[in-house]
Amino acid sequence: MSVLALDVARDVAAPRRAEILETLRALADGADATTREIASDDDADALERASCDAYFARARDASEARRACARASEKLRAGGALGVVVDDERTATATTEAMVLAGFTTVTREDDGVVRCVKPNWARGTAFALKSRAVRVNATAADAADAWGASAAADDDELIDESALLTELDVNTAPVKYDDCDVGAGKKACKNCTCGRAEAEAAEEATTAASEETFVSACGNCALGDAFRCAGCPYLGQPAFKDQPGTKVELDLGDDL
C-alpha cells in the first residue's frame, strides 16, 4: 500500500488546516493509500526515511517551499512524486528553484497552482563509471620500438638530399677548411705549414695592404680615431695618426710655464 504524506503548516488555524488537507488529498486522485499528516517537526521525525510514495505540501512563501522540498527529499522513495500548492507567482518561482536545488527532476507547474516534480531514481553517493581513455603506464620495449619505427618511416617520405640543394656555384665557392694548423689560442699558420693556411694569410695581408694604399677616406675622419670613424673604416682599432697611417699622434707633456 502506498504512503502519502500531507505536510500542513503548524501555525495554520484548524478550519484552514482542514481545507488545506482536503486540497492535498485531492491531489492524490483518490488513490488507495495510507495518509500521514505532518503538522509539526515531531510528525516529520516520526516518519521514516524513504517511506513515502508521494508527498504533498502547501507553501505560502519561499521558506516554506524550501522546507517542504527538504522534507520530501528525505521522506520520499526513489521515483516518488512531490506536489506543492502555491498561492502566487513569486512563491511558485521560489518553489521551482527549491525543487531544482534539492535534486528533483521533471519540475512542472500546473494551471491549478500546483508545482510538481519527481525524486530521481538514484541514491546519494551513487557511483557511476565514466568511460575514459586507458593510460598505459608500463609500455613494453617492443611498443616503444614500434612507435619509433613508425615515426622514422613517416619521416623517410619527406627527407630531401641536401646535396641536391647545392648549385655548381655553391660547390665551387665553398670556403677552404684548414686542418693542419692550430697554434696558441687563435688559429694561424705554423712554421712548416702544408695545409695552405700560410699562403691564404699572405694573400690576405697583401690584399689589406693594397686596399690601404689605394683607400680614399669618404668622411675625412679616419685620422681622428675610432670615435670619429665610420663603421666600415679599415683603420678601426688603430690609433689616431696625422697624415699617413702608422704615424702616431704624440702628446707634448712638457711644461708650458
Curated annotation (Swiss-Prot):
GO terms for biological process: iron-sulfur cluster assembly. It comes from the Eukaryota. The keyword Metal-binding applies. It is found in: Cytoplasm; Mitochondrion intermembrane space. Residues 181-195 are annotated as: Fe-S binding site A. HAMAP family: Anamorsin (MF_03115). Component of the cytosolic iron-sulfur (Fe-S) protein assembly (CIA) machinery. Required for the maturation of extramitochondrial Fe-S proteins. Part of an electron transfer chain functioning in an early step of cytosolic Fe-S biogenesis, facilitating the de novo assembly of a [4Fe-4S] cluster on the cytosolic Fe-S scaffold complex. Electrons are transferred from NADPH via a FAD- and FMN-containing diflavin oxidoreductase. This is Anamorsin homolog.
